[in-house]
Amino acid sequence: WNITDDLRFKASAGRYSQNLVAANSDRDVVNLFYGFLSAPDNLPKTFTTANGDVRDVKDPLQRANHVVAGIEYDITDHLSANFEVYLKDFRQVTNLNRNKLFNDTDEFADEPDELKKDYIIESGQAYGADLLLKYEKNNYYLWAVYSYTYVDRWDGFRSYNPVWDRRNNINLVASYAFGKFDAWKVNARWNFGSGFPFTKTQSYYGSTQYNGDVNYDYTTSNSNLAIIFGPLNEGRLPTYHRLDLGVTKSWRLDENQVVELDLSLTNAYDRQNIFYFDRVRFERVDQLPLLPSFGLSYKF
């Protein structure tokens, strides 16, 4: 809706469904890569909501209702602002059952589904706001965005923040083209993100695997190292931030042929951002250090 020539309002809403589930564990300290599997059909028959109501699970499809609204405003001929708010209401989400205690067999038929199924139903919400400022004039381009997000989940027993709940995120991008035919381009990008949730390690213990023999002597067996986890996702990882710089020089051979040389510097101030944490060895692995690189391309 064009309120004026400089002010616009926009909104959208929809109901979405999918039949995929992430193939990763929220017990990992850091999750940067995701695989996806088809969602399972063997789910609990009922789901207890956060307010205590019990509803039937009619099918395995995951569903969410999305609502987005925002305004765009042209502050000047070269500077514009975009502000959006959103709400995602996750009505039914499939997740691994971290509360499982029993096998899903006839022996435990009287136990509740929430304690024996491999997967459970969850619900939750994600809401937040995005503010974007964009400046374009001649060969200058500046782009700044701030995002605030809050995500929670309810698994039938407790409310918690999932591992992708990042409260604050900032992106700053700048580029400038100069020289004959704008043959030179320089660019910079800085990103800041507050820490993701993770579950702390509370303790370790030796897990003895019994073989079913009543004469089994557990005192002479070799135990496996097992972990006692702390409260679900009540820890927060360190903040993430990184600066990347780049320069591009192009040579136009004719209308259809261009040679480009790219020089870049990743993580320019050598920030130590966490990549992985080994709970057992209590060792941290960081992401890329300061990394220079170059590339040469030919386009025709």
Give a label for each model feature:
Residues 6-9, 78-81, 139-143, 181-186, ...:
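Repeated loop/turn-to-beta-strand initiation elements of outer-membrane beta-barrel proteins
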Residues 86-89, 101, 106-197:
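Gram-negative outer-membrane beta-barrel transporters
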Residues 63-67, 123-127, 164-170, 239-243, ...:
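Residues that define the transmembrane beta-barrel architecture of outer-membrane proteins
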Residues 2, 8, 24, 36, ...:
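Membrane-embedded beta-barrel scaffold of Gram-negative outer-membrane proteins
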Residues 11-15, 24, 83-87, 144-148, ...:
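Transmembrane beta-barrel strands of outer-membrane/channel proteins
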